[in-house]
Amino acid sequence: MKILFCHDHIFKEYEGEYYSPGKISIEQMESYQSLGDNITIVARSNKVTSLDSSKHNQITHNRVSFCAFPNASNFKSLILRKELLKKAIKIASQYDIIIARLPSEIGSIFAQAGRKLNKPVLIEVVACVWDNLYYFGTIKAKLYAPLAYVRMRNLVKQADFVHYVTSSFLQKRYPTKKGALTLSASDVILSTVSNSQRNLKKNNEISIGVVGSMDN
């Protein structure tokens, strides 16, 4: 079985291999190998001439490959969406299972492609597209939020298999159809924390951090 994983994540291509700046790891990709032997990631990519391997996860190896797809997260892509869908259908036709991580434009395009090809489509609901766009800060994002929200609701409603990363919030905003198989489980992978780290005394400094990608 050949699996296609679809998302807007921007990978870096360095010396023929693909790397993630942190959001996606090889461990996540290997978790899908119970569904099939080979996994192909379809997403955006940038070619770079240097890379700090300590800050990036290599995601390509003998069972995980990469397929670059055009940027679908700009105004131009809305006009060319039919062309992007045709391209997605051509790619998706070579695979047995489509995994679409939403919200993402590439994920939604390939979810549509999978339905047109009558392929099994598993949708991962990892965030609310309305919140992502409406509170992003730009007028264009606010105007696009209702369309993206309705589209994502429809895709989830039509899906036979849905994985939510929340216990109830996303389930209420993006309900499934009757009879759909659903899973509620976080997609976070935690590293082992030693007792010495747990027992560190708190200092008076306050650190504020942001979890997420700043380059999407």
What residue spans do the PLM features occupy?
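N-terminal subdomain of nucleotide-sugar transferases
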Residues: 1-53, 61-64
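Nucleotide-sugar donor phosphate/pyrophosphate-binding loop at the beta->alpha transition
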Residues: 20-24, 79-84, 131-153, 194
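Short N-terminal targeting/anchoring amphipathic segment
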Residues: 88-107, 119-122
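A short, histidine- and acid-enriched strand-loop-helix "catalytic/donor-clamping" loop
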Residues: 12-15, 71-76, 124-139
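Conserved donor-binding/catalytic core segment of Leloir-type glycosyltransferases
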Residues: 4, 200-216
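Short, well-ordered alpha-helical microsegments
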Residues: 49, 106-110, 170-171
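Active-site proximal beta-strand in glycosyltransferases
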Residues: 2-7, 115-132, 162-163, 180-186
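Donor nucleotide-sugar binding/catalytic pocket of nucleotide-sugar-dependent glycosyltransferases
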Residues: 141-207
